[in-house]
Amino acid sequence: MTIVVGACRRCQNRAMSPTPRPGPTAFVLAGGGTKGSFEVGVLQYLVGVEGIAPDIVTATSAGAIAATVLAQARTLPEFAQRVDEIEGDVLAWTQTEHVFGKQAWLGALEGTALGREIHNEITEGTRPPFPLSPTGALAGSEAVPPASAGRRERRQARRTRRKRQRHMLRLAAGAGFRLPRVRRHLRTSGSSVLNLEPLADALRHGTGDGVRPIDPALIRRPGLQLRLAVTALRAGVLRFVTEDGTIVESDARTPAPGAAAGPVDLVDGAIASASVPMVFPPRSMADDDYVDGGVIEIVPVRAAADLGATRIFAVVAVPLTLARDERDYAAAPAGYIGLRSMGMIGVAERQIANLNASLPEGVTLTTIDPVVDVVGLFEVQPGLLRINKDYGWLRAADVLAEGDAAIAADMVDGTHAIVEARREAWRLEESLWAAGPADGSAAGTLALVREQKELVRELVDRRKQLGFAVPDGCEAWWTGYEAHTTGRPGGLPVSPSS
């Protein structure tokens, strides 16, 4: 039988076995773009607090980048060091030049308003909506009103969409002199918008101030099995790249056709696993072209069991149960519909299917997953990345906590409330940063920030009183501002509490 521990709310119930056999431990790191910042916090808790070290690491997409760094370790102190490196790598993603490169056709629009608009739409357009404002509108989503909106709000939304369409047409007209060059590049690089060459270079050579290089020789050492999930476009199947660069079939062991040509570069394997189709180009390895393993397997739990793991920690970056989205999708642009249906609903359902995979008797599966959606798939806002990382730490502590079930459930609700309050404080601070202290509404906005900070302090105090863990330095959550892409404007107090 399989033991299921944790909060996989929509996974099927399974019988409990009282004495799971001892054996290898696996970390399974799911995909999710920059939502993977959640996984950093989970790893910090598992390794740094619980003292758990993996024998097996399987991963997909953004999880594969973290897994490649983690797989250089063999001892608990080494794992702790590598988790610190993963944190530094993820926070360095805010310097987009270390991660994303522009495909030639988008590069041809460099310096134009249209080029900036396209880039910003990718990095910020996937941001989860904030809760309803007091007026009933979705904050930041004026172009797509709630389904409950009245006639006036719908008219306003239509005007907003038409205004945006005219804006995009003006941008295209302004970049018209570049369009012949764009068309030429589209013939050769039109399969995607961005590329991951800067990240690949950083993983090979380092950036000096952000992403650190990996050492494939350390990964190849005995003592840890690594599997990076990739999707073979020509064969149309799931495969894995191993710790020594061998491409194997979906059973995680059998060498794939073309493997006889020799091992592939581990950085290529990690980048292929993270190459979301149409956003990033396929990666050619051996006799096939590969994209994100999450097309088929977002949470490669089965591979961990196939390699002999009897204790599996599945770390999920995208919520398994989606919050209800009140946008009126009958009136929404195609991009919103595609993101919601394929990028969110489809991902959630594949994750659940992966977590419900049939596992051998005696295997313990612990799922650590977010409930609050904090950051977009490719968003690089430093404040939201940090909030999501801290959320992962708290969520892992909640799932692994022992004691009274009612108190534990209360703490889980408290964790989500902490994250929501910090995210709302970040949003309010962003409006302060944009308007400046001279704006007439600044004092009122700052008062709202203070309310959120006080709520966070109260929730953390309650957590500590009940004996639940909190991370070191959490006082900064209410004594300071959240992180932003620019420094605090002059004229605002040094601390929101002052």
Residue ranges and their predicted role:
Residues 66:
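Catalytic DNA-binding helix-loop module of base-excision-repair DNA glycosylases/AP lyases
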Residues 1-5:
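Extreme N-terminal basic, low-complexity initiation segments
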Residues 8-60, 69-498:
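Patatin-like phospholipase
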